Structures are given as structure tokens and as C-alpha cells.
Amino acid sequence: MTKIKNDKLLISSDFYSVQGEGKSTGVPSYFVRLGMCNLNCGMSQLFTNKLMKEKTLADGEIFKGDLELEGKATWTCDSTSQWLWRGVDRDFQYLIDRWKEQGLYEDIVSGLIHVIWTGGEPTIKQHQEAILNFFRYWYSVDENAKSLIPDLAQRGYWPAAYSEIETNGTVVID
């Protein structure tokens, strides 16, 4: 199992798009897809362990899990890179740099572009700690961002970034 460090995020992918579900449907969003999931949708634990050991699947490969093939499940997870616990441990600065490189930074800081934490399962304990530490880091290193939204900064509302967590709803948040 990959150990998540408190100063890094295990990121499977990150990208800019438009939110396609929930109350923020249609809102420009930056998705941070984290590795690891606590479910084995459509697969037995034995099958999942075999896949993790052999690493026989390519990222994005669509297949049917053993339980789906046996008629014991109606579907199989479509996010292989997430439930196989894949991802790259990224320093917190990685996301800030990506947002700046893509010209999205000011709109993320001001909340015009939402940040969506998804996965995998972002509410797994290690991810909870890493996400909170990311925001602490962001605030500590990027005082200059306050000048982007001076009115909010003067009132103590920085960052004004809007963040959402997409979850499978099976993890209790402490």
C-alpha cells in the first residue's frame, strides 16, 4: 500500500474542465483526482489483490471485474488508476504551479473556478490530512495572492477559493 505523506498529495490526475454534476453543474472547475479507494466495486478482494500485484491494467483500460462477469455485480469501477491505489506523490507546490502555468490561478484564488477533490476516495483519513495541510501550506507561502482580491483579504477571507469534495459517502469524517 502506498503511504501518503502529510506534505504531499497522491494525485492520479488533475485537469481543468466544467463540473458535470451536483449543485455546481456548469461551473468551471479544476479537478484533483486522488489515488486510493476504499471500495472494490464489481470485484472480489482476491481479484483486486491479483490486479494490484500483477499491475496488468493500463490506466483508463475498461474491463469487467470478476463479480460482474459472474453476474454478482451490475457494474465495475471505471477508474482503474484510482482503485489500484496509483498516483504520484506530489509536493503541495505542484498544484499552485499547475494553476499558474495554465493561467487559472487568479480565478481559483477568487473562487470563480472551483477546486474539486475527487478520486478514488478523497475522504480516506490520509487524504483528509493531506488536503487540510495543502490549504495550510497554500496560505503560508502565497501571501501575494491576497493582493489579487484585496477587499476579501482585508476582511480576512483568503483564500476565497471554493473547494468541493466528491465522495462515495462511505467514510466518516472525523
Give short role names for the model-derived ranges.
Residues 12-25, 33-38:
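N-terminal beta1-alpha1 ligand-phosphate binding loop
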Residues 2-4, 9-13, 39, 43-174:
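Conserved Radical SAM active-site core
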